[in-house]
Amino acid sequence: MTDIDVRLREDVHVLGELLGETIRQQHGDAFLQKIEDIRHSAKADRRGPGEQLSSTLADLAEEDLLPVARAFNQFLNLANMAEQYQLIRRRDADQPEPFEAQVLPELLGRLKQAGHSNDALARQLAKLDIQLVLTAHPTEVARRTLIQKYDAIAGQLAAQDHRDLTPAERQQVRERLRRLIAEAWHTEEIRRTRPTPVDEAKWGFAVIEHSLWHAIPSHLRKVDKALLEATGLRLPLEAAPIRFASWMGGDRDGNPNVTAAVTREVLLLARWMAADLFLRDIDALAAELSMQQANDTLRKQVGDSAEPYRAVLKQLRDRLRATRAWAHSALTSNQPAGADVLVDNRELIAPLELCYQSLHECGMGVIAEGPLLDCLRRAVTFGLFLGRLDVRQDAARHRDALTEITDYLGLGRYADWDEEQRIAFLQAELKNRRPLLPAHFKPQADTAEVLATCREVAAAPAASLGSYVISMAGAASDVLAVQLLLKEAGLTRPMRVVPLFETLADLDNAGPVMQRLLGLPGYRAGLRGPQEVMIGYSDSAKDAGTTAAAWAQYRAQENLVRICAEHQVELLLFHGRGGTVGRGGGPAHAAILSQPPGSVAGRFRTTEQGEMIRFKFGLPGIAEQNLNLYLAAVLEATLLPPPPPQPAWREVMDQLAADGVQAYRSVVRENPDFVEYFRQSTPEQELGRLPLGSRPAKRRAGGIESLRAIPWIFGWTQTRLMLPAWLGWETALTNALARGQGELLAQMREQWPFFRTRIDMLEMVLAKADAQIAEAYDERLVQPHLRPLGAHLRDLLSQSCQVVLGLTGQPVLLAHSPETLEFISLRNTYLDPLHRLQAELLARSRSREAALDSPLEQALLVTVAGIAAGLRNTG
């Protein structure tokens, strides 16, 4: 075991000890002993037949349920914190830098060896367009208050690492840790009420304020340094290879709580927050830039001021204050922005650039390259709006709105027309100069809301908005329909209208739809920039299983690359990935490098889900590592794309997908007991009651199809069966081996990044799955006639593990990553009691009606949060 592992274990031990002290102070020695007994029972059950823990938990008194659940939940959160800090802790001089820190310098060296010139590398790096789209998440269960306390704990772990602390200073750090852990323990970890979409947006702003605001300039300094060392060239001031967007407050698909008024409020809050953050920067810069010497350009702006830089910054500060004040008052009353309000990012960037250039020209470059450069980088990356807000709505809502409009105008019912009739009507209206809607038209509520959203889009500054995403898009008319509704709302500038292809059938149809759209007269001429298309990972996996979904996503991207090239249109693919493998999640670096050749091309857009935002971007140091990985992967996929798959590999993949979807659907769709088994064996029904997000967990009444992808995955994750991530692979791979394709599969794993990444993700999820835990849920919750189905699914899980081990040639899953295995094992000691306790709580909850705020329901909520924290990927 390395020194690093030892230090991690020490941190976990210290945090656990301090938590124990806190619990003892509130609940006494006897209760703390109970926690220890449960922990030891969990360890014993891992080694033996597994009877001890269940009987210990079944004997718990009602009043002990909540504090026991809280104890194990808090421990897992502290263990997460220690592991996150471990990733960024200062290394000794003789230890190598982490992979994330070396990835860009190493890649630039490889690219030069491959024949790319210095100029070409610098140019490509400067024009990279990577957009990380932060999305709200029903399963992001940790409260902001607690996240801030955990961040402070990480800060104390860092302080504790300093070698030159005196005994008194070391004691001080220990006391601060003790106090923070006590604060966390005495803070309720679960919201009593559902967050609103505005609450979710504020959570996103907090991630920017506390982490990304600090990470971006530091990350870009290192990119600049790596580029300079490799090529002798600098990263231009206007370069922002990575920018941010958001769905929080803009994603109304299936969420009636996201209204036009909410979108307006979130856009204003973003402007207020941006002005406030930049004001803090400008105040700090004004204190520093006291120099007198300035170039003529700057002098022209401020005259003969004795402190010219401060004079420039004062002008900017006054405008930022005016912007912040206006945004604040506009939240409550609809008032136009005054002349002082900043509306264009250039108004923010220009004064900073002026100071930067002047300092360099006057021989004060060392000052220019300090905090002023950091502020400039932030201004270019975040701008006056922090990021762009996307709008998302279901295609059916636009269809219904147009049907009401055409019906009212006596033109017939839009919904009843075929695709050609719709396209003819939409194209004619898009060209028409007169409005489609008469002034006295009074639409129904749903149509009124769609039109109000379009008016908000038309009224907002262009730089504050990203894309208008159409979920469940299935035809070219779906895109034209949105363009027409936006035109009716008064939008005169081009806006990216983005079809989202989600189900297996839609992915297979994505090529023909885009072929039709790009072939329409005038459509391409209206594009400003690339054609954006979104690929959905969650619904396709729920519909067909991950084997068939992954291959359909790959083929759809290949087709889109080819079709856009034929039409001489640039393509931007937007990847709608979840945090889990069942929703397209996984390590971003590997995922980007496994995309089809030509599909990245300097541009990459992806969603970042709630709970993964915290793990990937919650601390500035970790955010920096993940930004490095994104940047390097997109640059590599652009300049060193993988070769296309060999025909033999494609044939194997076609067969794997066909076998996989059949095996998956035979269980999920064709077994009449499946839905009932799912509802009984997982906390799926209870998840709908929990205040876990602003969006309802169900679409409509019905079977699996009515479930949203998130609770579908979440339920299986809580019971550790992890079914959506692997079901179908066991049959597909077993059949391939039976056909004698073992050597071909090994070759694919070795030489084809797409296939290797799929198998690596499968191995990771199987290592976290646990048949013993899943069986414990069945024994406590499932009626006897459904238990054979549970046993069958666990057999399939075992088969999946065996076939993956056969493919990797390893004795155990993740044998190549002992540190990951060790951490899974460390977590299991604290996860096992939470799983068993959750099964016990579900049984008690289902046997009687409990109020939402009862200790029983609260304890159930805490187990959900704890298991999500322990597995670090929820839904």
UniProtKB/Swiss-Prot annotation:
- UniProt keyword Phosphoprotein present: no
Active site at H137, K542
Per its record, the protein catalyses: oxaloacetate + phosphate = phosphoenolpyruvate + hydrogencarbonate
Cofactor names from the entry are: Mg(2+)
Q: Name one Pfam family in it.
A: PEPcase
Q: Look up the record and give one Gene Ontology term from the biological process aspect.
A: oxaloacetate metabolic process
Molecular functions per Gene Ontology: magnesium ion binding; phosphoenolpyruvate carboxylase activity
Which Enzyme Commission numbers does its entry carry? 4.1.1.31
What keywords would UniProt list here?
Answer: Carbon dioxide fixation, Lyase, Magnesium
InterPro entries given for it? PEP_COase (IPR021135), PEP_COase_bac/pln-type (IPR022805), PEP_COase_Lys_AS (IPR018129), PEPCASE_His_AS (IPR033129), Pyrv/PenolPyrv_kinase-like_dom (IPR015813)
Q: What Gene Ontology terms describe where this protein resides (cellular component)?
A: cytosol
Give a short account of what the protein does: Forms oxaloacetate, a four-carbon dicarboxylic acid source for the tricarboxylic acid cycle.
Q: Which family does the record assign?
A: Belongs to the PEPCase type 1 family.
Q: What name has this protein been given in UniProt?
A: Phosphoenolpyruvate carboxylase
Organism of origin is Pseudomonas putida (strain ATCC 47054 / DSM 6125 / CFBP 8728 / NCIMB 11950 / KT2440)
Gene that this sequence comes from: ppc
